[in-house]
Amino acid sequence: MSNCNVDLQSIITGLSKLKKKALKKQTEMLKPFGLTSRHAGYIMALSDGRGMTMKALSETLCVDPANTTRVIAYLDEMGYVANDCQKDGCRKFNVFLTDKGKEIAAQMKKSVACDSVEIMDPLTEDEKRTFVYLLFKMAMDNYEE
């Protein structure tokens, strides 16, 4: 084992607190639409308009395919997504945001921008850029498939 002065538990705890704070804000914003933070990642992943397969969504969001199936079924029921399946029993199809889903995505983007400012307010501009850079560097170097 290498000589390491970094307390991994402190990093995990700090990131967990940030995540909890961000998810709480997200849930508050989505509540009037019958949605929670659980649905947010899917809406944002689909917000570029290209559509994605269920498998691609699961891989993009690093979630279990069964969770993707449940969330997309709910979003479909609520009218936020649709798919391009042309026949019953399609095994592979693309999921897209409906106009209603696109409206939510636009509101989420505005809300996320405001909440990001609030969460990162204690940091200087240089610290913000460094923080985001380091998070992505750690996430990408340690990504497991």
Task: Give the location of each predicted region.
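Alpha-helical structural signal
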Residues: 8, 12, 19, 39-40, ...
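Amphipathic alpha-helical linker/stalk segments
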Residues: 26-29, 60, 119, 139-145
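Short, locally clustered residues in the helix-turn-helix/winged-helix DNA-binding domain
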Residues: 16, 44-48, 109, 136
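C-terminal regulatory/oligomerization modules of transcriptional regulators
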Residues: 1-4, 125-145
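A structural preference for long, well-packed, hydrophobic secondary-structure segments
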Residues: 5, 25, 42, 69-74, ...
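Charged, amphipathic alpha-helical coiled-coil/dimerization segments
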Residues: 23, 73-136
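N-terminal leader segment of winged-helix/HTH proteins
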Residues: 1-33, 80, 97
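N-terminal helix-turn-helix DNA-binding core of bacterial DNA-binding proteins
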Residues: 20, 24-67
